[in-house]
Amino acid sequence: MAAALARLGLRPVKQVRVQFCPFEKNVESTRTFLQAVSSEKVRSTNLNCPVIADVRHDGSEPCVDVLFGDGYRLIMRGAHLTALEMLTAFASHIRARDAAGSGDKPGADTGR
C-alpha cells in the first residue's frame, strides 16, 4: 500500500468525486481511497483539483469518479475492489495521462 501511495499525485486530474453510503458494508476500501487522496501531501500536487466526498444515505454502491484534464474519465466501482487495487489503478492512469500530456509536443524542445 505504501508503494501505491508514494506514486500518488493529482497533477493531470481536474476533479475527484467519491460517492458512498456509510451504512453499507462494502465501503471500507472506498473510504480508505478517499482518505489517501485527501491527504495534504497528495492534495498539494494540484491545488486546483477539488476532492469531493459525496456521502449519501440511499444504499448506493460506492463509486469513485475521476475527471482528467484531457477529458478522460475513470470510474471505479468500489464494492468489489480493495483499496490497494483502486490506488494502483488510479496511479497507473495518472502516469498514463502524465505521459500523454507531456509527450512529444511540437515546440517543446527549448534548447538551441
UniProtKB/Swiss-Prot annotation:
One Gene Ontology cellular component: mitochondrial large ribosomal subunit
Disulphide bonds in the chain: none
Location relative to the cell: Mitochondrion
Transmembrane segments: none
Domain of life: Eukaryota
One Pfam family linked to the record: MRP_L53
Keyword set, alphabetical order: Mitochondrion, Ribonucleoprotein, Ribosomal protein, Transit peptide
Subunit details: Component of the mitochondrial ribosome large subunit (39S) which comprises a 16S rRNA and about 50 distinct proteins.
PANTHER family named in the record: 39S RIBOSOMAL PROTEIN L53, MITOCHONDRIAL, LARGE RIBOSOMAL SUBUNIT PROTEIN ML53
Similarity section: Belongs to the mitochondrion-specific ribosomal protein mL53 family.
Name assigned to this protein: Large ribosomal subunit protein mL53
Species lineage: Eukaryota, Metazoa, Chordata, Craniata, Vertebrata
